Structure formats: structure tokens, C-alpha cells
């Protein structure tokens, strides 16, 4: 997937038709068969006939403004635009005639007469569609001369830190406006003025930074000239080659082309064929990659014996040997279980797999954990119990077939913006939205979208709200009885029906506790049960909670009761927070589970790993991270290997975490920056950014995508190599020569990954969704199609238990946290990019009445 020369991706001009009916026509003497609804422009492109175009793009609806794609059709008058003309059976189309040549040259003359001819010094020289089309139509001179004064008096808008807007280069094709509207769904751009005075305007003729623009880059991607251009391209020039890889921010898992000049990244371009993002991106993935070469990067291994001593730079060999000797010393003194490890949801599947293997096989303990257990293990437990698998059920594409969406405890506009854009498109097409969230998130009321219901649930009462919705569905006869009878356990269902039908679970009875008006809750429940395909998407507002697992079960109950599982447009879908939260769970980063969610106490399962790894494994679950902290404070836990995780900043009760770290005798940090946790470390191993990684990430839709090395590890060693080196120094051999060999081992030991390999992923177009095995050799886009993984679905009783964390006289307010579009997690990466132009510090939002009571004015 390495391109030696950067080429513009093929564009068919208009979107593909989804029709199954085929239409035959003739274009320039060539017989062509395409789906009904296909444009003539696209049909020609499929046949290898490239009709000139400027306003058309296959990720935008046909517009027909540039007048370059005109064709001649037998039996029709005039010269219709091929982008807006659908094919018809028997149609005979001519794309090359003397009259068409004359018209196209005339159109191009008009464009060029009002365009600066500074091509040699233009940043888009060699990557400009206007330049290309001038050559295609054979334009050699301009009869009107060159005035070119239009817009030249307008200043370049360089307010955005990542791209510049030069109105003098604009041909008013409207592609940027349409991309903002159709692809992103922000509606931040418009055409201002008329005729020669027309120009693109951001907001109310504001600078881009002062407008509603979210800097997703869709307009830059759509622009056929240098009107909208990345500043890195302006500074560095055109790229020479590119590498396809996967973004390392949120759980969407966008595919990108890293366009390079030598060993430097020029720009990150969303890959059109990326199955998770379909050529779209957000401000983080598109632009916020500069942290990888930030001056704060730590590129040398370091050690120190005490945390109050200065760091000493050493060789990789000395750092590894020192870390290994400390692990051996501590285990000899305090026992095997005095050490443990933490995997990262930011690292690849292969790296994560090796860390848990290191802990189990080389350390000899099950003391391994991950942040993903805190944020999403309720999903694993809740879904495994009810429907049999620990992951979401659908693809992101599935949302385009939904009719009703429940969005609970999630704010995808900020946390999963590329998915949010696709959701917005479906909502603009007519799907209904129910938001269950304490906050009035952007999707409640955004451009051309208004939620049918916003249920402002009181923090901590999620389970009560969902059980009340189930009460409405059960007592009003809205259950899909046939589906339940065929797919679910009868006894468990009847117990659930009786439970939710009790009067104490009615919306009226729960309103005082949940804060949700009973009428709204009833309306939302009826809409979900009767509105057609119903899908549920949820986030950390559901799972990071004392009743997280119970709430996930309640979500699954609703889906089963209404028959909304096992087909397109429905499902239960957790929106994973980090790029490899799903993968870190899949890879066995839990103290009680081996890769594939199989319990360490299962003798048969453990035996498989023991035979493959050549070592005896502990049958008892190890310590979770909070237990490690407690044990460290009490004196029995003494060493920690922490890869790609800043636990001081990200884990709760910072003072307790710091006390635990101070009590340990050896902390090994593997990271790209000297973070807060590193203040307590004794060994620092330079980590690799995603641009230096080779392996796979697994996103929120179970999609395993390739991550490819864009540049060599700046610290001299890849993360997986460092883990292997430490294991070898401890006496347990890890002798892999490439991450593909690690994936082969994962596939050998994990049933849901049995058919996965790097070559398989490449053959599938860059990604594959697990389960991928003999039963599903090409992966599984939709889960539970014919039956649930566990056989019959199991309804669970979801008793509401009030949270212990309530407002008191001493603590009168409740704090709920949320994502910010421009920043990511604790900000280690994004704070080292120009994203600080939007948010350089955290802000606390407080109700005006609460602020007034406390004398807070701003």
C-alpha cells in the first residue's frame, strides 16, 4: 500500500447508485451496463471514458454548474450536463464531438479569463484540476485576454492555523460549500455576491476562525484549485509518495493517506476507500499530527534509581537490562505477584498482545489491566450476557438504513465527528433522533436537525430511564412478540416482562428520580418501538458508571424486545473512545481474561496458551489497576510496566494514584512524552507515535485496520521491539521479526481472529471486521443475523440502584465531563498541535443560577 508517486484518487463524478436494476446504454460506441439511477458522467467513467468536469465529485450530489461535462444524446435537443442526466435504457451518448470541444474550450476560456496565471508559483501546481482541464480541452489561448483583477484585492484569509483561503483562485464551483453541507453537515460556508462578485464566505463574511467552521478539511479536500490549501503544502510543496494508514485518535478508525516528501509528512488526506470514514475526516485526524515530531518528544532511553534524582540518558541495551534486573530483584524479594503491567488503548493490537503476554509469560502473573476495562468493560459484560458477544453489532454504514436513533451518553459531534457527520446526513434525510443525556448536546438542535426527543436524564439514573421505556413498550403492546419467541429465552423474557411492567417502573413513577418528563419518555419509547429500524448508540455516559453493565443490559433488552438486532439499520453500538479500545479488550488486557475474552480459570483455554507459549500460566485472575494501587500503598505491589498510558492524569483519585506510584520501587514508562506518570518512573523507554507503528487497530465497529509505518521510529526502536527486548532480558524468548508474525499468533489462539492476517486485511481492501474465521472468512459486518452468538437472547432484570455520588451540603454540585472536538483525552497529543487555537485550557460550565448563587460572574 505504498505509492511511489502521489496520484489523485479516481473520481467518478457522482455518487454510486444503490439500485439492483441494470441499464444498458452506449457511450462513444462502447456498450455500458450500470445500475439504474447512475449518471451519464459516472457511467462513462466506469467505461473508462473521462468526461471533463470541475464542479462534480463522486462524494457530492450532482450540481451541474461548471458546464464542462456537457454531452450529446441521440434524440435529444441541446447538450445536457452528464452529471445531472441519469442513464436510460438504449441511450446513445457522444462525449467527443467538434461542437462539444468548442463549447468546452469556450467555458474554460471564461474560467481562465478571471483566474491568476501564476501556475509556476502556485502551491497547487501539478495538483490542480483547473490546470488539468485546460489541458484536456486543448486550451492554448484565451480570446478575451487576461484581466484577472476579480478578487485580487481580497486578502488571503490565513486565520485558520491549518489552511489558507485565497479568493483570487476561486472558480465558484461550490464544491467546498456542498462538502460542508453534504459531507460534514456544518453549513458553515455559502456563496456571497453575484456574477463576477461571487465568492465563498465563511459564516457572515467572517474569517474562517470566527465562523462555525470545524476545520474538518472537507472543503480543502473538495477544492479543485489552490483556493483552499493546507499551509504545509504551501510551505513544503507537493508530496512525492504516500502511505495508507489508520488514524490514532478516536474509535472511528479513519483511513488516511500520509503524503510524504522524503521522510517528512506533508499532509494527511482521508482515504477515499477507507471503509470506516469514506473519505471524510475531522480536525484531529486531518491536521493534528504535528505532535509526532514535536520538540517535547523523548528519543533516548533514560534511567534513575530514585525519582528525586535527575534522569540519565543510556543506551537501549542498558535501559532494558536495568529494567529486567529490577523486575527480577523485586520478584525475588516480594514474590511474582508484586509486579504488573498496563496496556494502552492507543497502541496496536500486536503491541497490546505482547504486553499482556509479557506480564503473563515473562512476569508470571495475571496482573495486567488497561484503561479500556474502566471505560468499556461494562459493554463487554452487558452484551456478552444478553446476546453473546462483547462488541457492537453493526457497521458505521448501517446508520444510513436506520429510521430511529437513540443516542445515549455520547456526544459524537465532539468525540466521533466523522461518524456524527454520517448520522447527521441520515437525520437530514428524515430519520428520527432521541437523545438521552444530561447535556443539551449539539445534535439536539443543529443545522437542519432537531431531535424528536431530548430526555435530560439526571446523572446516575440511566437504568431507571431505560427500564421506564421498557415499561411503556411492554404495557402498551409494542413488543415484537414473533421475534422474541423465535430468538430469545422464553422464561427470561417473561420474567423481564413482569418486572418492567410493574407500576413502580412507569414513566410517571420514575419522573421525580430521573428528571425526565413522563410524557416525553412515553413518546420516545413509542417512537423507538414503532418507528421502523431502530438503532442505539451509546458512549461513556453509559459505561463509566456504577450501573454501567446494568444499563448496557437494559439497552440490549430494548433492542431484543423490539426486534432491532441482526439486520441493517438497527443494533446496539458502543462508541469506543480511543482508537484501539476495542482491540485492547480483544487482546486480553484484563486480569481475568486471555485474548478473545476467555477466562484464565478455564483449564482448556489456558492449556492452549500454555502449549503455544511454552510456559505455565496462573489460573487465578490478577489485580485490576485500582487493586494494584491499593496493594502498592499497603506495600505488596512494587513494580509496574506502563505502556502508552498517563495514569496520573487519566485515572480517578490522583492523590491516591500518586501515593501508590511513590510507594513502588520500579516503574517502567514507555511513551512518546515525559508525562505526569513519568515523574514517578525509574525507567523511561521512548515510545512510537502512530506514524512510526506497523500493525493493526480495531475500531468501534470491530473493524481491524492496517497501521503502516510512515516514518522510522524516532527513538530507534518500535514499541513491539522494546517489549520483546524486555521479555528476552527476563529470560522468556520473544523472537518475532515483524508484527505480521504477532498477528499470526493472535489468529492461532483467538477464535474470532482465526482468519485474520495482514495479507487477508490487504485483500479485503485494508480492513476486515471480526469474527473472521472459517464460518465467516470475509469477516462479519453485522452480528447476530440468524441467531445470537449465545444462541437464544437472554433478557436481564435491570433493577435501578441510586448512585452513592449525590450532591450534599459539603459537595452541592455534580461534575459531569465531556469531550471537546479539538482536544483529545488528557491532551498529550493535541495540546502539542495548533488545535490549541480553539481550546488551550479546560473550561467548567455551570448553570447561571448556580453561578449567581456562588458569586461567579464569568
Describe the role of every protein-language-model region.
Residues 2-5, 14-18, 22-33, 37, ...:
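N-terminal export/assembly segments and adjacent metallocofactor-ligating motifs
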Residues 27, 339-343, 534-539, 574, ...:
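Short hydrophobic beta-strand segments
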Residues 32-89:
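N-terminal cofactor/phosphate-binding cores enriched in small/glycine residues
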Residues 38-42, 86, 348, 624, ...:
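Short, structural beta-strand-to-alpha-helix junction motif
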Residues 55-56, 194-195, 370-372, 570-575:
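Beta-strand segments within the central parallel beta-sheet cores of soluble alpha/beta enzyme folds
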Residues 376-568, 575-755, 818-858:
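Non-catalytic alpha/beta scaffold blocks inside enzyme catalytic domains
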Residues 584-585, 590, 739-834:
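Long, low-complexity segments enriched in small/aliphatic residues
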Amino acid at each position: 500500500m505504498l505509492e511511489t508517486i502521489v496520484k489523485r484518487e479516481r473520481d467518478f463524478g457522482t455518487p454510486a447508485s444503490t439500485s439492483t436494476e441494470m441499464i444498458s446504454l452506449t457511450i462513444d460506441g462502447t456498450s455500458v451496463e450500470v445500475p439504474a439511477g447512475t449518471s451519464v458522467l459516472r457511467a462513462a467513467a466506469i467505461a473508462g471514458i473521462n468526461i471533463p468536469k470541475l464542479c462534480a465529485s463522486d462524494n457530492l450530489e450532482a450540481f451541474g454548474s461548471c458546464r464542462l461535462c456537457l454531452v450529446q444524446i441521440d434524440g435529444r435537443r441541446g447538450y445536457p450536463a452528464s452529471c445531472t442526466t441519469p442513464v436510460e435504457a438504449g441511450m446513445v451518448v457522444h462525449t467527443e464531438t467538434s461542437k462539444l470541444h468548442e463549447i468546452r474550450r469556450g467555458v474554460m476560456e471564461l474560467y481562465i479569463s478571471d483566474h491568476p496565471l501564476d501556475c509556476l508559483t502556485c502551491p497547487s501546481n501539478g495538483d490542480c484540476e483547473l490546470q488539468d482541464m485546460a489541458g484536456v480541452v486543448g486550451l492554448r489561448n484565451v480570446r478575451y485576454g487576461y484581466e484577472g483583477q476579480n478578487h485580487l484585492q481580497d486578502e488571503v484569509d490565513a486565520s485558520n492555523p491549518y489552511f489558507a483561503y485565497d479568493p483570487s483562485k476561486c472558480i465558484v464551483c461550490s464544491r467546498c460549500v456542498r462538502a460542508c453541507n453534504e459531507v460534514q453537515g456544518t453549513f458553515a460556508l455559502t456563496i456571497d455576491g453575484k456574477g463576477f462578485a461571487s465568492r465563498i464566505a465563511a459564516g457572515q463574511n467572517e474569517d474562517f476562525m470566527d465562523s462555525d467552521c470545524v476545520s474538518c478539511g472537507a472543503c480543502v479536500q473538495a477544492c479543485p484549485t489552490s483556493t483552499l490549501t493546507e499551509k504545509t503544502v504551501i510551505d513544503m510543496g507537493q508530496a512525492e509518495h504516500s502511505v495508507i494508514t489508520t488514524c490514532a485518535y478516536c474509535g472511528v478508525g479513519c483511513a488516511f493517506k500520509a503524503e510524504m516528501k522524503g521522510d517528512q509528512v506533508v499532509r494527511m488526506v482521508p482515504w477515499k476507500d477507507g471503509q470506516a470514514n469514506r473519505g471524510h475526516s475531522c480536525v484531529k485526524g486531518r491536521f493534528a499530527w504535528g505532535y509526532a515530531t514535536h520538540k517535547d518528544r523523548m528519543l533516548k532511553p533514560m534511567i534513575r534509581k530514585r525519582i528525586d534524582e535527575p534522569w540519565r540518558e543510556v543506551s537501549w541495551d542498558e535501559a532494558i537490562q536495568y529494567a529486567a534486573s529490577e523486575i527480577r530483584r523485586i520478584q525475588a524479594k516480594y514474590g511474582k505477584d508484586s509486579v504488573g503491567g498496563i496496556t494502552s488503548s492507543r497502541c496496536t493490537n500486536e503491541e497490546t498482545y505482547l504486553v499482556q503476554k509479557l506480564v503473563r509469560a515473562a512476569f508470571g502473573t495475571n496482573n495486567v489491566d488497561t484503561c479500556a476495562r474502566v471505560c468499556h468493560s461494562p459493554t463487554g459484560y452487558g452484551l456478552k450476557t444478553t446476546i453473546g458477544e462483547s462488541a457492537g453489532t453493526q457497521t458505521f454504514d448501517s446508520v444510513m438504513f436506520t429510521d430511529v436513533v437513540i443516542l445515549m451518553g455520547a456526544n459524537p459531534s465532539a468525540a466521533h465527528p466523522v461518524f456524527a457527520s454520517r448520522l447527521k446526513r441520515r437525520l437530514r434525510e428524515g430519520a428520527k433522533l432521541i437523545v438521552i443525556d444530561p447535556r443539551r448536546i449539539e445534535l439536539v438542535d443543529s443545522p437542519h436537525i432537531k431531535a424528536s426527543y431530548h430526555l435530560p436524564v439526571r446523572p446516575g439514573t440511566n437504568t431507571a430511564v431505560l427500564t421506564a421505556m421498557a415499561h411503556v413498550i411492554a404495557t402498551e403492546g409494542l413488543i415484537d412478540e414473533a421475534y422474541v419467541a423465535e430468538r430469545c429465552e422464553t422464561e427470561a423474557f417473561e420474567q423481564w416482562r413482569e418486572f418492567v411492567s410493574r407500576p413502580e417502573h412507569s414513566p410517571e413513577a420514575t419522573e421525580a428520580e430521573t428528571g425526565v418528563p413522563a410524557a416525553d419518555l412515553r413518546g420516545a419509547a413509542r417512537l423507538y418501538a414503532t418507528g421502523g429500524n431502530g438503532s442505539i448508540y451509546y458512549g461513556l455516559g453509559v459505561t463509566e458508571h456504577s450501573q454501567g453493565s446494568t444499563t448496557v443490559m437494559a439497552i440490549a433488552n430494548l433492542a431484543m424486545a423490539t426486534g432491532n438486532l441482526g439486520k441493517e439499520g438497527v443494533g446496539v453500538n458502543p462508541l469506543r473512545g480511543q482508537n484501539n479500545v476495542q482491540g485492547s479488550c480483544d487482546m486480553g488486557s484484563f486480569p481475568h481474561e486471555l485474548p478473545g475474552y476467555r477466562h484464565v480459570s478455564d483449564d482448556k483455554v489456558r492449556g492452549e496458551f500454555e502449549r503455544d507459549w511454552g510456559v505455565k500460566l496462573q489460573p487465578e485472575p490478577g489485580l485490576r489497576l485500582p487493586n494494584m494501587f491499593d496493594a502498592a500503598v499497603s506495600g505488596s505491589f512494587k513494580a509496574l510496566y506502563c505502556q502508552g498510558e498517563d495514569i496520573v492524569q487519566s485515572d480517578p483519585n490522583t492523590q491516591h494514584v500518586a501515593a501508590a506510584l511513590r510507594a513502588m520501587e520500579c516503574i517502567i514508562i514507555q511513551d512518546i512524552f515525559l508525562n505526569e506518570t513519568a515523574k514517578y518512573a525509574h525507567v523511561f523507554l521512548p515510545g512510537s507515535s502512530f506514524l512510526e507503528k506497523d500493525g493493526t487497530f480495531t475500531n468501534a465497529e470491530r473493524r481491524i485496520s492496517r497501521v503502516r509505518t510512515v516514518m522510522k521510529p524516532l527513538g530507534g526502536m518500535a514499541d513491539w521491539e522494546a517489549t520483546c527486548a524486555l521479555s528476552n532480558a527476563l529470560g522468556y524468548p520473544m523472537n518475532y521479526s515483524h508484527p505480521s508474525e504477532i498477528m499470526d499468533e493472535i489468529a492461532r489462539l483467538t477464535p474470532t481472529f482465526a482468519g485474520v492476517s495482514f495479507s487477508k486485511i490487504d485483500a479485503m481492501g485494508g480492513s476486515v471486521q471480526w469474527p473472521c474465521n472459517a464460518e465467516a472468512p470475509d469477516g462479519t459486518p453485522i452480528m447476530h443475523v440468524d441467531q445470537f452468538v449465545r444462541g437464544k437472547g437472554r433478557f436481564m432484570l435491570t433493577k435501578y440502584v441510586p448512585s452513592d455520588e449525590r450532591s450534599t451540603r459539603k459537595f452541592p454540585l455534580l461534575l459531569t465531563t465531556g469531550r471537546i472536538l479539538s482536544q483529545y483525552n488528557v491532551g498529550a497529543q493535541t495540546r502539542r498541535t495548533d488545535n490549541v487555537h480553539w481550546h488551550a485550557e479546560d473550561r467548567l460550565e455551570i448553570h447561571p443560577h448556580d453561578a449567581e448563587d456562588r458569586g461567579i460572574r464569568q
